[in-house]
Amino acid sequence: MLTTPWQEGAPSGVFEQWVVALEFQPAWSQGKCDEAVAQQLSGSFAATHLSVHGLWPNFEPAQHGGRHWPQYCVVAGSGGDNYTSCDPATGGRANGTICEIEPATWAAFNGTSSGTWPTHNPEYAFGDLAAHEWAKHGSCSGLTQEPYFALVEARALPLVSGTGGALVTSRVGGNASHAELAAAFGADVSGKKVSFSCSDECALSDVWFALDRATLAPIDCADPDSCVDKCAGGIHIIDWDKDGCH
């Protein structure tokens, strides 16, 4: 009997699907006004647009004993890195070298005026989400760090600027129905099913898409949708400059 839906310490590079995760930063930063990310939000791109959360290797459960995703993976070969040492649940970042963002990666994505993280990934630029995403998910991708984050952006940024993202921006401070969001985001992925995550107050926090690993073609997202049943009255898009930290 499975005790968790994930496989800790799975072999890196063994999976069948990707999940592209976008987040709405105002929902993540509410109640965290002392954090650097929240202090950067007012008037920013992320205050009114979706941000990049991550790109997650996912299993076809039938091929992995019912498990849904790998995490904190182990790289094959002599001397291969074991990212289970990075899991906060088991001590967290015991091996700082492999668990953190490399200087070259910071330079490529965050350290120059052309870096994309301050605009599109504020939790990466001003928080510790980049290190978390690399250790938990990137370690399972079969890629090294810079190519992994380049793929994250290649898959996620077109969705940020797509039909669904435009709908979110247009409804800041108001509501959108689940059907409206599903149709708008579905139009960006050939009509495939998209999943959403909402707070207990029905504020939109995440949007998840699924891709076939081999072809990168959109497929139906099997991740649970926490908005569809509880938010029949509408899904709220938080206006940070009105309802955020002041």
Feature names for model-found ranges:
Residues A36-H246:
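Domain-level detector of nuclease and nuclease-like folds
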